[in-house]
Amino acid sequence: MAKKSKIAKAQKREALVAKYADKRAALKAAGDFIGLAALPKDSSPVRMHNRDLIDGRPHAYMREFGMSRLNFRQLAHKGQIPGVRKASW
């Protein structure tokens, strides 16, 4: 489980990215780089990092499922992820 402060910080960044997305796109299209520099740093989507939706773990993130490999493995063994089966060959 990630620290609550790290999870909260990531959520705050996501909110800032969503808030400034239209303004950032307009400034970028106009070529106003001074205006872009005046926006908050955390409003840039590059600064976002994928985190596990269940416990906030930042490493070993599986983009297709939105969770880390550890939670993916647990839920897959329980059969709670649709379309995922244990491999056998």
Swiss-Prot record:
Disulfide bonds: none annotated. Keywords: Ribonucleoprotein, Ribosomal protein, RNA-binding, rRNA-binding. Pfam families: Ribosomal_S14. It comes from the Bacteria. InterPro entries: Ribosomal_uS14, Ribosomal_uS14_bac/plastid, Ribosomal_uS14_sf. GO terms for cellular component: cytoplasm; small ribosomal subunit. SUPFAM superfamilies: Glucocorticoid receptor-like (DNA-binding domain) (SSF57716). Transmembrane segments: none annotated. GO terms for biological process: translation. Belongs to the universal ribosomal protein uS14 family. PANTHER family: 30S RIBOSOMAL PROTEIN S14, SMALL RIBOSOMAL SUBUNIT PROTEIN US14M. Part of the 30S ribosomal subunit. Contacts proteins S3 and S10. Binds 16S rRNA, required for the assembly of 30S particles and may also be responsible for determining the conformation of the 16S rRNA at the A site. NCBIfam families: PRK08881.1. This is Small ribosomal subunit protein uS14. It comes from Leuconostoc citreum (strain KM20). The lineage of its organism: Bacteria, Bacillati, Bacillota, Bacilli, Lactobacillales. The gene is rpsN.
